Amino acid sequence: MNEPTQITDTKKRYAAGVLKYAQMGYWNGDYVPKDTDILALFRITPQDGVDPIEAAAAVAGESSTATWTVVWTDRLTACDMYRAKAYKVEPVPNNPGQYFCYVAYDLSLFEEGSIANVTASIIGNVFSFKPLKAARLEDMKFPVSYVKTFAGPPTGIVVERERLDKFGRPLLGATTKPKLGLSGRNYGRVVYEGLKGGLDFMKDDENINSQPFMHWRDRFLFVMDAVNKASAATGEVKGSYLNVTAGTMEEMYRRAEFAKELGSVIIMIDLVVGYTAIQSMSNWARQNDMVLHMHRAGHGTYTRQKNHGVSFRVIAKWLRMAGVDHLHTGTAVGKLEGDPLTVQGYYNVCRDTHTKVDLPRGIFFDQDWGALKKVMPVASGGIHAGQMHQLIDLFGDDVVLQFGGGTIGHPQGIQAGATANRVALEAMVLARNEGRDIKNEGPQILRDAAKSCTPLAAALDTWGDITFNYTSTDTSDYVPTPSVA
């Protein structure tokens, strides 16, 4: 890599024509980021023959003020301040041809409290830039002064636990299955059985909205009837995530208002509604004392590939600022993408007060979250009672463990499946609190608990050996990929 020289002679710098991005001032290897800068780390793969520093400068330019040619109107602005500055480029370990590119952006480039504006700048244009074979946004750092322009989660972990009166353990949930095709009445029956058996939550899946087989209003009515009956039967606060995702904001508000009228404690939206809609629903949830659950539907289209797209750790940061209370963040042991360390990094982003640099977990920047409330991570997708020790060891207490098929697919029925999960959870938490090594003793702890719980014994017999131990595509560049098997 050759250290380029910025053209400082005004006449030459603004002469009509084309200059390299580094020469225009989008590279500064001596730049020291300010406390008020927004920082971004990109993984870039330059085209053959393209100098990595020039590629980094192009990323900085195209994500801030540059265009392909010199424009004299730059001189009408404080262009030296507004130009993003690539300030460090280093090879990605064990990935020839890939480079980590650090870029600093002046805070005044961004609108306060707008994730839509952040994304339009940082990922809006540069990812289709021809000099790059591929680009991926790996991490970001936001100054606390900018973080404070966002309201963040409307409820947060602490208040949610107070409303539920449930402490000292993970929360339990399940997604109603099959997620499409049930009538409203049968859907409500599934919800009742799951909650009566010991779950804290049931939930809609990402693509259940309002279809010919079940209108959204029917679903809400039958589900809330089931929630109320299960709460009365168990003496516990129960809930079911009512998906209010719709084609317009007006319709989403209408569905959310109806959920509130029925007494729901929680509503749900999908990531695909977009960041402006997410922030709008977050404001509504805050004004109406409602927990807001976020399903990350669609994220894998741009988070999964290691060399191109956006890391989910960045999405998690954006969503914490945008203001969601629950966020699907991976299981590490289930059927969906994510190795243990990388997924733990996502959880830390959701739950930390101050996130520290942690390269094995993919965290490249310190992040002060100011007074933003914490997001409750959700582990969902291909998990079952036999993995309870792994889940608690990996993620601790502040997590929702959602067993969809692992509840509804139980050989003795839905209520038995819920009971199996609740007993497995209670047994594991008790063993941990007594000082036992649940990571290594977990299988035996579960077998001992199953001696007095037929549903748990059946669950272990059915799924005890089921794993999804495939190699993840998105792993740390700094440590070998660990296994949970």
Swiss-Prot record:
HAMAP family cross-referenced by the UniProt entry: RuBisCO_L_type1
Keyword Protein biosynthesis in record: no
PTM annotation (N6-carboxylysine): residues: 203
User: Which family does the record assign?
Assistant: Belongs to the RuBisCO large chain family. Type I subfamily.
Query: Organism classification, top ranks?
Result: Bacteria, Pseudomonadati, Pseudomonadota, Betaproteobacteria, Burkholderiales
Checking CDD domains in the record gives: RuBisCO_large_I (cd08212)
Q: How is the cofactor bound?
A: Binds 1 Mg(2+) ion per subunit.
Entry GO MF terms: magnesium ion binding; monooxygenase activity; ribulose-bisphosphate carboxylase activity
Q: Its catalytic activity?
A: 2 (2R)-3-phosphoglycerate + 2 H(+) = D-ribulose 1,5-bisphosphate + CO2 + H2O; D-ribulose 1,5-bisphosphate + O2 = 2-phosphoglycolate + (2R)-3-phosphoglycerate + 2 H(+)
Q: Give residues annotated as binding Mg(2+).
A: 203, 205-206
Question: What GO biological process terms does the UniProt entry carry, in alphabetical order?
Answer: reductive pentose-phosphate cycle
Name of the encoding gene = cbbL2
Quote the EC number.
Answer: 4.1.1.39
Q: Please give the superkingdom of this protein's source.
A: Bacteria
**Which residues are involved in binding substrate?**
125, 175, 179, 296, 328, 380
Specify the protein name. Answer: Ribulose bisphosphate carboxylase large chain 2
Q: Which UniProt keywords apply?
A: Calvin cycle, Carbon dioxide fixation, Lyase, Magnesium, Metal-binding, Monooxygenase, Oxidoreductase, Photosynthesis
Q: What does this protein do?
A: RuBisCO catalyzes two reactions: the carboxylation of D-ribulose 1,5-bisphosphate, the primary event in carbon dioxide fixation, as well as the oxidative fragmentation of the pentose substrate. Both reactions occur simultaneously and in competition at the same active site.
